[in-house]
């Protein structure tokens, strides 16, 4: 619209004004045509169509003619002019008839309106805006906020879990009527395939605990959560408590820096007395930062979210103040901490592992199932199952483990690996569900319709004890067979010698033979007998017991009898079994099978020494319940034991474990005719 000379001069003048610091950066509006607003008033004109413009535009005749031709003078004649319709259009419009809305359609519209009600709720809009901005931050959308934010971020599972805890609790407290609808939205937003009711109840809890190894971004992740909550949640009150003042001050400055550089243009950000507040015109969102040495600052507050960083190292006096917020129904307390398992004072939150409701989330490089085997291998740095994720910025190798333990013995397991050491040491090996299933579900082995599915071989393990001390040890005998992929217990005996005057070998052999003959007579489909007599205590006595059992059994039945043979010191195969390092392997295999439901008992179980006073299965379950693992020191082989103080011995459970262990085909070659 301007001539070449005028346009050049205006552009030059505009460039000069842009360089001045006193002049605002945005001097040309995109909403209004004020391109000549900076020229002198003598050269300005006000035009109906052009607005404030340079007076030179009046000399541009085509522009003036165009404006005059299409000018709206707001004349009454134009507004009152009668509109003319074509006759065919008028007749077609007259023939149109409208049907009344059906009840089904009206109901569907009401349902649709109810479904979309959530998305029109102002509280939901705040949650949705928070999720949108957080997703933008993860994708690197805030490149101007903080150095490094331009890179895409991938959250660890515990960080995503922490974020869900925060958002879901806020959604439940702010929109209680639409809580279930918000849940569906969160499942979609976080791309969760399935969420059980138990998990939903966990998210609704007023307190949750995260135990995470060091250097995993616990404090780093809290900063954006607080920042975006302040921006989008109107009227929210957040509390942050750290174990040291310099940590709380660091988080305070980082949150303030992020708020001022991200959205200070839209909101007023204020930092006063360790409180960051954002004015939303209608209400203020605040975040208070304190240390455990000044817990009086959090008294009297009305927090919606209270974050306790490094909770294991918070002073116990301050913990009482923090736990007082549990009485407020709109407060969520999140404890986040690393652990040092050398001291109970720095891992006391692990006691929550036995809580009736799940509130403890433990992150470790090693799962609880393989923690002990990991401890035994001095150079291991990864879990054998490789199920756990290790971030790329974490470097763990055998040299790191050796170096840490050189500075302080056990430092690698106590300080670096994670917070499961104290939990796993007291973990029961046999689950309650498997014990109840073993006690209730017993197969009937006399059912003729099931004969074809039962194994034809009976395995018997005998652990002799040559003492009369009932508290020390007794003779354990177990008879086990197969049923498809499961193992059936046919007979159990726990025999104690009356006195040392009688022949111990004869008494033990008679007890075992009596049970074996009874089992064989009840189950005619058994056509082979495999016996293993333990010879660790006395090999000569074990050989004699084997011979006596063979004579007693073969005198009553024509079944084929095989014994487990082991070379003696003269390299002669003898009918006894020497238990060695394979005991630990047998116990671990039994635990796996028992917890998986592969160990079952027969309804017609034979027992002459137990059945008089106890149910043999309940008697066996008492010993199974006592089964525990004993680790002497790091790098040493662990042992298993079922002995507890003032409780019965573990002879019977050892016999059952070894009988099921020897059922494997890999041991078949060791069974021979004696």
Swiss-Prot record:
Its EC number is 3.1.-.-. HAMAP family: HSV_TRM3 (MF_04013). It is an enzyme of class 3 (hydrolase). The active site is at 310 (for atpase activity), 463 (for nuclease activity), 534 (for nuclease activity), 651 (for nuclease activity). GO terms for molecular function: DNA binding; hydrolase activity. A motif (Walker B motif) lies at residues 305-310. Interacts with the terminase subunits TRM1 and TRM2. Interacts with portal protein. GO terms for cellular component: host cell nucleus. The gene is TRM3. Belongs to the herpesviridae TRM3 protein family. GO terms for biological process: chromosome organization. It holds the Pfam family DNA_pack_C. It is found in: Host nucleus. InterPro entries: DNA_pack_C (IPR003498), DNA_pack_C_sf (IPR038435), DNA_pack_N (IPR003499), HSV_TRM3 (IPR033663), P-loop_NTPase (IPR027417). Its main location: host cell. Component of the molecular motor that translocates viral genomic DNA in empty capsid during DNA packaging. Forms a tripartite terminase complex together with TRM1 and TRM2 in the host cytoplasm. Once the complex reaches the host nucleus, it interacts with the capsid portal vertex. This portal forms a ring in which genomic DNA is translocated into the capsid. TRM3 carries an RNase H-like nuclease activity that plays an important role for the cleavage of concatemeric viral DNA into unit length genomes. A motif (Walker A motif) lies at residues 212-219. It comes from the Viruses. It comes from Human cytomegalovirus (strain Merlin) (HHV-5). Keywords: DNA-binding, Host nucleus, Hydrolase, Viral genome packaging, Viral release from host cell. This is Tripartite terminase subunit 3.
């Amino acid at each position: 619209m301007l001539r070449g000379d005028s346009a050049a001069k205006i552009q030059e003048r505009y460039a000069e004004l842009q360089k001045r610091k006193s002049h605002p950066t945005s001097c040309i509006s995109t909403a209004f045509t004020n391109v000549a607003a900076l020229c002198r008033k003598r050269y300005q004109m006000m035009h109906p169509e052009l607005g404030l413009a340079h007076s030179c535009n009046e000399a541009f005749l085509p522009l003036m003619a165009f404006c005059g031709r299409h000018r709206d003078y707001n004349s009454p004649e134009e507004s009152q002019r009668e509109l003319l319709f074509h006759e065919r259009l008028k007749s077609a419009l007259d023939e149109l008839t409208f049907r009344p809305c059906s009840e089904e359609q009206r109901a569907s519209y009401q349902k649709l309106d109810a479904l979309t009600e959530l998305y029109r709720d102002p509280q939901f809009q705040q949650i949705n805006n928070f999720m949108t901005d957080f997703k933008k931050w993860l994708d690197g959308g805030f490149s101007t906020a903080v150095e490094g934010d331009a890179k895409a971020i991938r959250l660890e599972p515990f960080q995503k879990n922490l974020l869900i805890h925060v958002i879901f609790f806020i959604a439940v407290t702010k929109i209680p009527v639409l809580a279930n609808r918000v849940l569906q939205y969160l499942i979609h937003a976080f791309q969760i395939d399935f969420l059980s009711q138990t998990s939903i109840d966990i998210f609704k809890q007023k307190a949750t605990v995260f135990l995470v190894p060091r250097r995993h971004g616990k404090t780093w992740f809290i900063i954006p959560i607080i920042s975006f909550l302040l921006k989008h949640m109107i009227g929210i009150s957040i509390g942050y408590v750290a174990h040291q003042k310099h940590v709380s001050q660091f988080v305070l400055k980082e949150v303030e820096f992020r708020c001022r550089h991200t959205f200070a243009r839209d909101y007023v950000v204020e930092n006063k007395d360790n409180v960051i507040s954002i004015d939303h015109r209608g209400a203020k969102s605040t975040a208070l930062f304190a240390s455990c040495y000044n817990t009086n600052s959090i008294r009297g507050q009305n927090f919606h979210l209270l974050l306790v960083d490094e909770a294991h190292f918070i002073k116990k006096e301050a913990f009482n103040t923090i736990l007082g917020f549990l009485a407020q129904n709109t407060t969520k307390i999140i404890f986040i901490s690393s652990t040092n398992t050398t001291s109970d004072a720095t891992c006391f939150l692990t006691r929550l592992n036995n809580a009736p409701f799940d509130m403890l989330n433990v992150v470790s490089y090693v799962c609880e199932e393989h923690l002990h085997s990991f401890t035994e291998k001095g150079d291991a740095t990864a879990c054998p199952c490789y199920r756990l994720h290790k971030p790329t910025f974490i470097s763990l190798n055998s040299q790191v483990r050796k170096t840490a333990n050189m500075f302080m013995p056990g430092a690698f397991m106590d300080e670096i690996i994670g917070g499961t050491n104290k939990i796993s040491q007291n973990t029961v090996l046999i689950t309650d569900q498997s014990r109840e299933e073993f006690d209730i579900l017993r197969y009937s082995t006399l059912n003729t319709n099931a004969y074809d599915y039962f194994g034809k071989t009976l395995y018997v393990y005998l652990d002799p004890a040559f003492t009369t001390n009932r508290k020390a040890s007794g003779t354990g005998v177990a008879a086990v067979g197969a049923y498809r992929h499961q193992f059936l217990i046919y007979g159990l005996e726990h025999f104690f010698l009356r006195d040392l005057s009688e022949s111990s070998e004869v008494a033990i052999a008679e007890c075992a033979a009596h049970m074996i003959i009874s089992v064989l007579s009840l189950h005619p489909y058994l056509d082979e007998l495999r016996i293993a007599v333990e010879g660790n205590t006395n090999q000569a006595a074990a050989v004699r017991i084997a011979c006596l059992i063979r004579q007693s059994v073969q005198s009553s039945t024509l079944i084929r009898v095989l014994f487990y043979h082991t070379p003696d010191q003269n390299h002669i195969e003898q009918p006894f079994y020497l238990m060695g390092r394979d005991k630990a392997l047998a116990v671990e295999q039994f635990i796996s099978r028992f917890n998986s439901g592969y160990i079952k008992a027969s309804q017609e179980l034979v027992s002459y020494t137990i059945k008089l006073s106890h149910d043999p299965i309940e008697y066996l379950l008492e010993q199974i319940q006592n089964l525990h693992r004993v680790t002497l020191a790091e790098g040493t082989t662990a042992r298993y034991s079922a002995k507890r103080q003032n409780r019965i011995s573990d002879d019977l459970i050892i016999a059952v474990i070894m009988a099921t262990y020897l059922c494997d085909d890999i041991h078949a070659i060791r069974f021979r005719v004696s």
